Amino acid sequence: MPFFLLDKLSVCDIPIPVVLMEGIYGNYSYLILSYIDGDDIGNVYCKLTDSEKKQIAREVVAIQQKVSGIDLRADKEWNWNVFIDTMLYRAEGRIKTYQYFDINKIATIKKLQCELQEYLDKVRPTPYLDDISTKNLLICDGKLSGIIDIDWIGMGDMLTFVALTRVALLNMDLDTKYIDYLLDEIHPNAVEYKAFVFYCLVYCVDFMGERGMQFLDKTIPVNKSIIKRLDDIFDVLMEEWNKCYE
């Protein structure tokens, strides 16, 4: 968790760790952070009531709105389309390598990208926390207690964190009422909602590409059930995309 990010976020009055000490030990720099009690929302999601999910969603969107106002400037070459292209390129390479899923799904999403190009071209480099999905968002006794593992701050469309969370919940075979509450707080218009569904599809193929991969000493599990579940999620999302045009 880089110090400069915590320093930037410290002005937002949001529940993040406090830097207690920093220093250098040998060739390594280190931070000692305050402890925040709680567990990842994905680990306790089944225990949350609808009212608790709604309150958490309200607080998360309020946090994102605060983060959007920090002074963080994008590189001159920043372009939101590069983010999308990079995600799809990575997923395509992985799916080709492991061959658990139909590579034509990438081509399908690229066609949707063209249909959404006018919207994507207008996305500005707005700061937001892009990795608070089913992890990194701590819950204690049904309440939001903190945000951890902030390795970077996203720049672009805040709807991506909602899309990532939705696909993660679907992949865990959990309900998505929390997503409904997040969207209720964000109030996306018709075009923004289409973009949200598009981002869900992008993250879906990203999840597909990870299946069977080796990360350090961990292999991402893959079997017929997992393959079917992700294929089904993709199909449901495509149906939703098509309904956006009805």
Task: Please describe what each predicted stretch is.
Residues 37, 53, 57-58, 65, ...:
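An alpha-helical support segment within catalytic cores of ATP-dependent transferases
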Residues 10, 20, 45, 141, ...:
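Short, flexible helix/strand-to-coil boundary loops that buttress conserved ligand/catalytic motifs
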Residues 1-78:
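ATP-binding pocket architecture of kinase catalytic cores
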Residues 159-191, 200-219, 229:
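Active-site activation/catalytic loop segments of kinase-like enzymes and analogous catalytic loops
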Residues 49-50, 146, 163-165, 221-226:
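Glycine-rich, phosphate-binding/catalytic loops in enzymes
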Residues 29, 111-162:
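Active-site acidic catalytic loop and adjacent metal/ATP-binding pocket
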Residues 102-106, 188-196:
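Short, surface-exposed acidic
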